[in-house]
Structure formats: structure tokens, C-alpha cells
Amino acid sequence: MRNQILPLLLVAASITANAQQKKDSLYTRTIEDVKLHKTGNPNNARVSTIKSQLDVMETPQAIAIVTHEFIEQQQAQQLSDVVKNVNGVYITSARGASQDSFGARGYTFGNENIYKNGSRVNSGIFPEVSGLERVEVLKGSAAILYGNVAPGGIVNMVTKKPLFNFGGNIALNYGSWNNVKPTIDIYGGLTKNSAFRVNGSYENKESFRDIVQSEKHYFNPSFLYNISDRTQIIIEADYLKHHFTPDFGLGGLVLNTTTNESKLNTLLGINKFPGATWQYQTNEMLTSTVTLNHEINSNWNFNTVAFFQDYTRDFHGTERIQWNLQNNGDYVWKRTLNKQLQEQKYGSLQFNLNGQFKTGKLNHKLLVGADADYLQADTYSYQLQKQDGTFADAGNNFVYGTNGNTSNGNILLSDENTWKSGEMLNSRQKDLNRIPTRRVGIYAQDLISITDKFKVLAGLRWSYLENKSTIVENYLNNTKTYKASSGNPKESAFSPRVGLVYQIDDSFSTFASYSNSFNPNSGRDINNLPLPSSLIDQYEIGLKKNLWKNTLAFNITAYQIENSNLAQTAAFDKNGNINGDTNIKEMTGATRSRGIELDVTGNPTPNLSINAGYAYNNMVYTDTPDSEGSFVEGERLVRTPANTANASIFYTLPKYVKGLKLGFTAFYTGERLAGWNNLKDKNGNPKTNRMYEIGDFTTVDFTIGYQFKKFNVQGRLGNIFDVVDYNVHENYSVNPITPRNFYLTFNYKF
């Protein structure tokens, strides 16, 4: 990856050297949404995530937008700080503190649900928020536009774009635990037809957690050129390197290793770190995007987006902290050590044609598009050298106990002296697993205005997914083999979408919609054949209302999502014997997710901005076989809070102390279940409880800032009441939320 960074630096240097301080005197395609940034009302916006010319008010789907103004007001440090402003979106876990995992409407987001400028991007890294223009969240199914995505929604990060008027800002941030972060953003015109932007940051910080520290570099140059009055090209690059201490938190307390019955670990202080003092993880990601926009005429336009991503994850450390209860009442963790290198190369290409036309008395807004992508995912596994000089596979079976003991990995929760780690061990590469995947999609949708008020949206997507055989290269015996994919090698599906919109006027609309998506499954059936995808139906109704002279959005949505063919462990094998292989499955389960979402967003006055929301979700298993290994009907799925809420208010004093801004933010996360959902025994009854409850919590932040001419000073006191709670992945990555903290920003705009 390093040999690809130098060209970025040269491009940025040439751009900056040739920058001209010149106002835009030529018509150009609008980069910033003026209505959105002026009113703060997402209902007034044109959202790039939906790929079409539809306004938010005529789109039969819930949409949320968090602008850069709000990101800056809240002094957000990572993407999770941003999406918490979207009702119904929540953090499901923070596995190893290497990434935030999000969920919505009962479903967990994966790589298929996180996008940058409309292109799928790896979610295994903390994105840099200082380079974001805004974050768009398309709730519910987005299958017709993006293919096999989880039905909870997608998050699209829109990066800052070039501007023709010269300007920028320089900022220095400082916070708790020696958090130092300078940022810079410079933009301007190069010629009357071209413009640039360069922004970047450096962050170095420690943590309230012992041992844990982090260092991050970010660089984002972009270039815009108006080829003609109707044609524009934007070239962007984005480089992020994050070196940090992987942190699996406090670990769970396992009461029974046979049943995995567990409970929350409250025996350790939130600062305690039982891992190796030297462990590390380095994530690097380089992305580049080329976007071509062309207006054919006043009614028709198309755009093409080419995207490339190079991602690397280098991990070496302990993981999966599980304290097992002993007969003497103490807890023991058999500490293990792993080393792994992951490399991903991903490329995508999409084409969208939008047009407006009439057939008789009917008005149409048509979208026709196609996309294709290719992913090569490489995973290198390692062997580590034991104290006796021999090598053994790194992972769950390689123990690493007190002072680096490689024959006895047991450490005691009650005795921190047993946590001591030795030096980093020698290693050698064992093998490479390469998984190639490619996807193709073709889609079309049309919004038909039957009357000025009544509109119908109909669309269809065909998706093709190919999972090629995994290539395995063993470096120890110099062999190369192929093994079948764990999923279906070739699969295709149609995803329909139908919506009805009744728009009373420009400020009030109601809608109802149906959409269908598919979710690929891993595993095999009893005949050793790959499983088909699960098909998921979603129904949604809602209303969108603009208040206060269209400066305030009030939206309500209700939904139901049904998965009627959930893949579960098969009860019996093909010979009729009880099945003990969890990789052998059958399409016999069903889940249902129901919920409501309410939000109020906007700037009712020039000095006041409001963002508030509430969401309720209930996702349960509705149908499972009465056989051993099946899930339990009526049981809520783990990691999905029933209730979430958010409220933020910022007010700038117009007189007396002009320029003084005060802000208040509160986030509520309801009770959740950690661990794993329960399974039935051979009689169809629930086995020992594998889940445990995590209590609800509310964090409150207070912000104060003062702006004088081009200078701005702002401070935030986070988690004022020093609330203690946790994000939990299964039963082993138990990460405490950040305690009371402060964050200061000194900013100069030019």
C-alpha cells in the first residue's frame, strides 16, 4: 500500500501550489445542498444515497441526514458519535475496540451496509469523521439499489468536495487522556473550471483503559473539473492508517463452560486490561473514487462511479476474554494468543441514468442502473514460537499465560500478578486463504405521478452473486489447494419494490411501501448442497411533515420485517440420525421485526438547531422446529435494544454575549441481551439460559463555544453523570463506554 501513497502526496502538492483565490463565476453542479445546510431539515434535501432525482418527501422510505454542521457542533470523534443522532440506529458491539458495529430495526450491519460516496466500503476500521460533509442513512431495505444488504438500512458517508471559493480552516483538538488531534481543510479554485480540496488530520491518544493507546493518520485530497457546462468529473482519494492497542475489554463471566451460561463482568474496574502489554493492531485503508456526472438535457442525466479500495488489517494479541468459574469461586481465563494478517482489494463500477418525462397525463421519474464489483479477500495465518523452541498454530489453542507461559495459559481474575505478559513471540507465516467474490446487479424504478398528490413507485433489481472456490496456499509444505465456498457458489435473485405516496402539499406526505431483499447463507443442507438465500419481506408506512416554514421536519415510520426461511441447524442428518454438525442446516426458521420511529430535526430559527428521536423495536423468533439445536419461539434476538432515543439542542445567543453557543445532548439505549440466543433440547424445551441482560443507560453531554470573527473555541463535557455501562459482543468482548471526559477545539477559518 505504501507505494500508492506517494502519488497522492504529489497530487495534493501540485493542487495546493496552483490554488487560486477566485470566486466561482461559472455555473457548476451544486456540491453542497444549500437548503439542507440552511434549514437543517432533511426533508428539504436531495439525497445522493437513493441514486435518483426523487425528493425526500416523495420517497416512500425513512431517510435521515446528519450534516457536517451537526458533526462539528457535537465535536464527534468517530462514526458512532454521528449515527447516534439517527433514531433506531444503535451500536451492537465494539469487538476488540477495532471498529463499531451498528444495527437498526433488529438487524446487524455488515460490510454490505456501510458506504462511502455511494460505494461499498470495508467496515473493519474507524472512519475519520473530520473529512465528512454529511452522513446519510437510508433505513429499511435498500436491496433494489445495492443488492444483498441487511434489511435494517445502510449508512453512506459523503466526504467533503472541492469548492471554487478559496477557504478552509485549521483546528487543534485536545481531550481527556492526552487526546491530541490537529486537523486542516483547504479548498479553492485552480482555474475557472477546476477546483480542489485537501483535508487531513493526525490523532494521538491514550485511554481510560490501562495500556490502551491509539495513533491515526488521515489524508483526503480531491479534484473537480467542469469539462463543459453539462459535464463534470470529480477525483477523490482517501488514506487512513490506524495503529492501536486491540482491546477486548473486561471479558464475560462464564458460569458453565458446557452450556455457555454467562453473566456481565462487574468484578473488574472499567480501566483494567488483562491482555498482553505489547499487543497491537494496524488497520490501513486507501480508497479512490472517480465520479463522472453528465446532463444530457434539462430532463435527463447520468453518472458513473468507479471505486477502488485497498484494505489491510495486521493483528497480533490476545482475544476472546472468557473468565470461567472454578469450584473455589474464582474465575480463570485460559489466555490465548493470535496473529493474523488480512488484505482486501475491492473494486466497483456503477452507472445510473435518470430521466423525467410524460406519457399522456402521467409524469415519470425514471432510474435505470447497473453495478458490478469484485472482492479478493486474503487471510494469512501464522505459527508462533513456544518457549521450548517449537512452533504451533496461533489462535484459540495457543496459550499465553503468566509471563508469556506457552504451556499453561491460565490467569486469575482475582490476581493481577498473573496477568503479566512476556515479550512478543517469534512468528512465521503458515498459509494463505484467498476468497474471490464478484457481484453484478441491474435495476430500474419509476415514480409515476398519477395526480399532483398521488404517486406510485415501482422498481425491480436482478442480482447475481458468485462465491468462487477458496485458494489455500500452505507455505510450510509448499502446496496449493482449492476448497468449495461455504456459501452458494452461484446465486441470483430478484428484489422488487412498490411504494405509494400521497403528497398533500410540498410540506406533508404519507407513504406505504413493500420491498424484498435476500440474505446469502453459509453452510450446507443434509445432502451437502449449498443453502439458498433467505428472502426477507419488509412493509413500511409513515408520514413526513415540515413545520415552522419548512425549517423543521417531523417524521413517523412504522415497519414490519419478516424472514420466513431462516437457516438453522438441521435436527437430523440425511440418515435420520441426530445432527451434531452446526454447519449442516435447514431452512425452517422464521423471525419478525416490528417497530416505530419518530424524529424531529431542523433549525426553527437561525440560532437554534434541534435533533431528537425515539425508536422502538421488537425482533423475535416466530417459528422454529421442536428439535434440538433450534432457537426458541418468542425470544428476543440478542444485541437489539427495544428502546433508543436521542435529543440534541444547540442555541447561539443573538445578543448580550453575541457568538456564545450552548449545547445539550442526551442519548438513551434501552436494555439489551448479550451472549447467544437459547437453543432447544431434544424434547423441544429451552436449554440452560445462554443470555444475560445489560441494563439501559443514558449519557448526557454539555457543550459551550464562542465565536469571534474567524476564531472559534468550543468545549464539551461528555457523559456528565459518569454513567457506567457496556457494549458486548457475544460473551467475551465486554467494552465499557467512555466515562466522564472533556474535549476542546480551537478553530481558525480563513
Task: Locate predicted features.
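Acidic/polar loop-and-plug regions of large Gram-negative outer-membrane beta-barrel proteins
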Residues: 203, 207, 222-226, 230-295, ...
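Membrane-embedded beta-barrel scaffold of Gram-negative outer-membrane proteins
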Residues: 293-297, 301-307, 313-317, 509-510, ...
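Gram-negative outer-membrane beta-barrel transporters
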Residues: 452, 586-677, 745-749
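Outer-membrane beta-barrel translocator/receptor signature
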Residues: 131-133, 144-221, 227-231, 286, ...
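Acidic, small-polar-rich N-terminal luminal/periplasmic segments of exported/outer-membrane proteins
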Residues: 30-165, 541
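Structural signature of Gram-negative outer-membrane beta-barrels, strongest in the C-terminal barrel
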Residues: 226-228, 344, 363-365, 371-375, ...
